[in-house]
Swiss-Prot record:
Expressed in somatic and germline tissues. Changing K67N: Loss of activity. Its cofactor is Mg(2+). Its main location: cytoplasm. It is found in: Cytoplasm. The active site is at D164 (proton acceptor). GO terms for biological process: cellular response to arsenite ion; cellular response to toxic substance; defense response to Gram-negative bacterium; determination of adult lifespan; JNK cascade; male meiotic nuclear division; negative regulation of defense response to bacterium; negative regulation of gene expression. Belongs to the protein kinase superfamily. CMGC Ser/Thr protein kinase family. MAP kinase subfamily. Induction: By B.thuringiensis pore-forming toxin Cry5B. This is GLH-binding kinase 1. It catalyses: L-seryl-[protein] + ATP = O-phospho-L-seryl-[protein] + ADP + H(+); L-threonyl-[protein] + ATP = O-phospho-L-threonyl-[protein] + ADP + H(+). It comes from the Eukaryota. The lineage of its organism: Eukaryota, Metazoa, Ecdysozoa, Nematoda, Chromadorea.
């Protein structure tokens, strides 16, 4: 539904208009105050971080996605996430990372500032929808994993760990081009990760063992997440569907087996005692975890290593409980199952400039201070870009 509403006096009515969009899932309305270049809005999806619509851009004549950040200034945590996502989207650039086309606020002063909008390239589906609607052939499985790895390699080279990879944060189009989005939980690689991550609320199913058990973590948490997503693409079900943190660990070790003493010795005292108190499990064979019957046999191509056996070998090395034994992103990109797609300009693209200040993750800022930081960044973006006709 598209309805023009009276424009708030704070907005420039010659440049902005208001459109109310109905969320058919939640049964709620959301009002978008956007430049007049964007018309024909329709609901795309909604989540904890915001509402996303499709729109026509009259300037570029392209269809775009517009995300209205969901109440970014209600809590400190949501404001921090909004700031982090805004900075990273404006700086990280790679073919497999969603591209920011425009960003703006209709609010003209800090005192009235309450809305932030991000305009991005439109992708037709998220990976969650694809996984649960289609059986994917080997070529598509391989291509999706390759592109996911290219995206996280670029993030890692740019000093960023995504930390929240999951099917709903990955989008694809009808040409099977894949892009990663949602950087609200991303963090710089070289911060102190030995402390517990108070704001690390990545979807539990894709959470690495070292995070669950309170160990320091590295960029290999992203490899674990891609491995879980890869298995889900094959099986069409979540690999480790834990009900809570403890059950998540139970699901993992009951499939992959009890870790060795070297790994357990690295845990804190209480975590080590807990892990040792559990019944020991032998690892299940990966031929049981992702059986041949879950692949499309007619799409195998042994000449380029597109077989269940080779796919399982990649998965086996991505889903190591001990991150020291787990594949790096470079290891994974050189694996036969995905190497057929290797393009140097995709795999080794120059690192993006990263203006995100790692120290700000630990800064004790008030909600008003976070709001001012975001306002200043949006104003900077608007000063550097023509948001109305550029």
């Amino acid at each position: 539904m598209e309805v023009d509403l009276p424009v708030h006096n704070e907005y420039d009515a010659s440049r902005f208009h208001q459109v109310t969009i109905r969320d058919p899932i939640a049964g709620a309305d959301s009002t978008f105050t956007i430049p007049t270049r964007y018309v024909n809005l329709s609901f795309l999806n909604a989540g904890a971080q915001g509402t996303v619509v499709m729109a026509d851009d009259l300037v570029t004549t392209q269809r775009v996605a517009i995300k209205k950040m969901q109440q970014p200034f209600v809590m400190t945590m949501s404001a921090k996430r909004a700031y982090r996502e805004f900075i990273l989207l404006t700086t990280i650039k790679h073919p497999n990372i969603i591209r920011l086309l425009n960003a703006f606020t209709p609010d003209t002063s800090l005192s009235t500032f309450r809305e932030v909008y991000l305009v991005m390239e439109l992708m037709t589906h998220n990976l969650h929808e694809v996984i649960h609607r289609l059986r994917l052939d080997h070529k598509t499985l391989s291509f999706f994993v390759y592109q996911s790895l290219c995206a996280i390699k670029h993030l890692h080279n740019s000093g960023v760990i995504h930390r929240d990879l999951k099917p709903s944060n990955i989008v694809v189009n009808d040409r099977c081009v894949l892009k990663v989005l949602d950087f609200g939980l991303a963090r710089k690689k070289n911060v102190d990760t030995s402390m517990r991550m108070s704001d690390y609320v990545v979807t539990r199913y894709y959470r690495a063992p070292e995070v669950i058990l309170g160990l320091p973590y590295s960029e290999k948490v992203d490899i674990w997440s891609v491995g879980c997503i890869f298995a889900e693409m094959i099986n069409h079900t979540v690999l480790f569907p834990g009900k809570d943190r403890i059950d998540q660990w139970t699901k993992i070790y009951s499939v992959l087996g009890t870790p060795d003493d070297h790994f357990i010795s690295q845990l804190g005292q209480s975590a080590a005692m807990y892990v040792r108190s559990l019944p020991r499990h032998q690892a299940r064979a990966f031929s049981e975890i992702v059986p041949d019957t879950n692949f499309l046999p007619e799409t195998e191509n042994p000449r380029v290593h597109l077989t269940p056996h080779v796919a399982r070998d990649l998965l086996f090395n991505m889903l190591k409980i001990n991150p020291e034994e787990r594949y790096s992103v470079e290891d994974a990109l050189n694996h036969p199952y995905v190497k057929l797609w290797f393009k140097d300009d995709e795999v080794n693209a120059p690192a993006s400039e990263n203006r995100y200040d790692q120290e700000i993750d630990f800064a004790d800022k008030t909600l008003i201070e976070w709001k001012e930081l975001i306002f200043n960044e949006v104003q900077r973006y608007q000063a550097d870009h023509d948001i109305f006709t550029g």
